[in-house]
Amino acid sequence: MLDLSKNPLFDLNSRTLSVDERVALSYARARLVLRSYNLSISDVQSFTPKFWAMHLDPILPLDFGCFTILAAHLNLTVGTIARYLPQQPDLIPLVKSLLNLDTVGVFLLSERGHGLDAFNIETTATKYKNGFILHTPREEATKFMPATTPAFGIPKVAVVMARIIVDGEDRGSRFFLVPICTAKEMYPGVTSTRLPRRSGTSPLDFSMTSFNHVFLPASALLGGSLDAPTDARSAWWDEVWRIPYGSMAVAAPLMQGLKHVAYIGAQYSLRRHVRVHGPTPVPIMTFPTQQLAVLYAVAAGTILDVWYRSINLWTTASSTAWPWW
């Protein structure tokens, strides 16, 4: 396990910073973490122990904005693209840029009008000559809510789910690779509207993203097939196969955070003294009510950590090995 706590980026008191300064710090920390672990394409695709070790780094509960960037970037964007590298090796330079966080990957699936029913998304990619026209047909089809602004000096690229339309026929939903912004500005036809900050969380530049007749080359389609699936729902689940793993990753910093809380609570309970019946102060850890709370947190953190690591081993064993890489 790496010791990132000694790095100056994690020694800053972010509570004294402005919202935008905190967001910028989260991006800088995410880049530091990813470069420190130096993950390969195979690590991401095959869920190696090194891949899960990054998610379980005890530094991540200190900045959930940083973890949010990493979780979506690696699990959803890089993981989705990596599946198609054997058929589209021209994407390898992009994936290497993503793994170095020189470029941030964004996963645009759900829409303002389609969250849990994302199978029914409305964004379209209409076949046009040697490419596609990506378009948001109405406000409810705006992609919600990954961070897509150029405000923090990092280029962003997205995997965008859209319905393929060929000669007026709906061929089902597929992922397209779409440049979102440079380090300074949005690409033509792409609009990002930043959402208000959510209270009680690490801030990020969460946004609503829409497309106005954006031309995409044929190579933007991940997988390349224009055929309509025989089973549209099964095909859709196959497209979004990384989501269950991404959902599992979200629990990692929460369990590390529980262990942090248990340690802090135990140390405080040993240090804090009060007078009870006699003149000599005693630590509040001597009270059964305090012992129960601390020991419960220690037990829960330990058991969940063992359980989570066993699930990690299952994902590694069940993944497809990549002998070509």
Residue ranges with predicted function:
Residues 122-126:
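Hydrophobic/aromatic beta-strand elements that line small-molecule binding cavities or substrate pockets
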Residues 102-109, 190-193:
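Short Pro/Gly-enriched beta-strand edge/turn motifs at strand-loop
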Residues 1-104, 115-116, 127-133, 316-321:
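Amphipathic, small/basic residue-rich leader segments at the start of a protein or domain
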Residues 133-191:
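A short core secondary-structure module
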Residues 118-120, 153-155, 170-171, 204-206:
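Short, solvent-exposed loop/turn segments at the edges of secondary structure
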Residues 121, 144-148, 195-197:
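Short beta-alpha junctions and helix-cap segments that line functional grooves
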Residues 127-136, 171, 178-325:
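Internal glycine-rich alpha/beta core junctions
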